[in-house]
Amino acid sequence: MSDRLTLLRPDDWHIHLRDGAVLQHTVGDVARTFARAIIMPNLVPPVRNALEAGGYRERILAARPAGSRFEPLMVLYLTDRTSPEDIRAAKASGFVYAAKLYPAGATTNSDSGVTSIDNIFPAIEALAETGMPLLVHGEVTRSEIDVFDREKRFIDEHMRRLVERFPTLKVVFEHITTADAAQFVTEAPANVGATITAQHLLYNRNHMLVGGIRPHFYCLPILKRNTHQVALLDAATSGNPKFFLGTDSAPHAKHAKEAACGCAGCYTAYAAIELYAEAFEQRNALDKLEGFASKHGPDFYGLPRNTDTITLVRDEWTAPDSLPFGDNTVIPLRAGEKLRWRLLEDNA
């Protein structure tokens, strides 16, 4: 088994950078590894049109480390009021690459989200016409639905109908967490893909709940039972081009996570590709990592693959206990624990 792994530089097809002073930290972490990233728009207020996306993009670019060529790929936040004109203007901007469907209340800052998918059918039709993907947080959020069943219910109630109603629409089923979602994407037409996070490949709900509640494993969609984790590993390491890397790295200040009502989100951007390498190594599938991390995503979006490379080496190191996050700190996933792979910063 090789102790050195060289890949085409990967992209992150789902990340949260937040806004304001924290960008100096979050942008540096993602730019360390990734050439491009799909930037989630769930700010307060959300990124609802091309003008707001352009302003957010400029703030991200201003926070890039010196010499960085990292490219943020901007996303619109769909609301009940998003119009086809908003979609067409976003496409014409040249820097908005997708639109995001958050069911209202599904995750952090999603209160402005869509109350009924039927309300945005005209906007979805415009997405299909322009070729822009629809990114879907696939959970039903009604109070009577068990939190562990939200994803499957979304497939049954909405996802099948959405794909059938808009057969030419590119759809990314984001951060899938269940065997049901993996099977749905596998069996769906070629215009349906999915991102998978590192935490859902490496962990299941036992890691979060057994022996004490571990808030830094809490994210949405929530970690599921180990049988779903196995199905996600099967999908990610299969070589199927429908599945690609999306960290859903989502930082919150320490005090907001370690609280009586803690926020959802795992911070993985600081060591994302290293964590994915561990997951793929568990399956003896390191040869499949480059496709998942560096090829399938740009191919799905119709963008060129990166041409430069990164190199990982098998070299154990200890993750930091905390990282700066504006005036606060963020506790990264695996804080204080050993990681088995290390990114060569100089790519030597």
Curated annotation (Swiss-Prot):
Catalytic activity entry: (S)-dihydroorotate + H2O = N-carbamoyl-L-aspartate + H(+)
EC nos: 3.5.2.3
Protein name: Dihydroorotase
Superkingdom: Bacteria
Binding annotation for Zn(2+) 2: 100, 137, 175
Keyword Iron among UniProt keywords: no
Binding, substrate: 16-18, 42, 137, 220, 252, 264
Positions that bind Zn(2+) 1: 14, 16, 100, 248
GO molecular function, one term: dihydroorotase activity
Family the entry assigns: Belongs to the metallo-dependent hydrolases superfamily. DHOase family. Class II DHOase subfamily.
PROSITE patterns linked: DIHYDROOROTASE_1, DIHYDROOROTASE_2
Cofactor details (free text): Binds 2 Zn(2+) ions per subunit.
Entry GO terms, CC: cytosol
A matching Pfam family: Amidohydro_1
Function: Catalyzes the reversible cyclization of carbamoyl aspartate to dihydroorotate.
Residues with N6-carboxylysine modification: 100
Transferase listed as a keyword: no
Keyword terms: Hydrolase, Metal-binding, Pyrimidine biosynthesis, Zinc
Pathway: Pyrimidine metabolism; UMP biosynthesis via de novo pathway; (S)-dihydroorotate from bicarbonate: step 3/3
Active site residues per record: 248
Subunit structure comment from the entry: Homodimer.
GO BP terms, alphabetized: 'de novo' pyrimidine nucleobase biosynthetic process; 'de novo' UMP biosynthetic process
Cofactor names: Zn(2+)
Species whose genome carries this gene: Pseudomonas entomophila (strain L48)
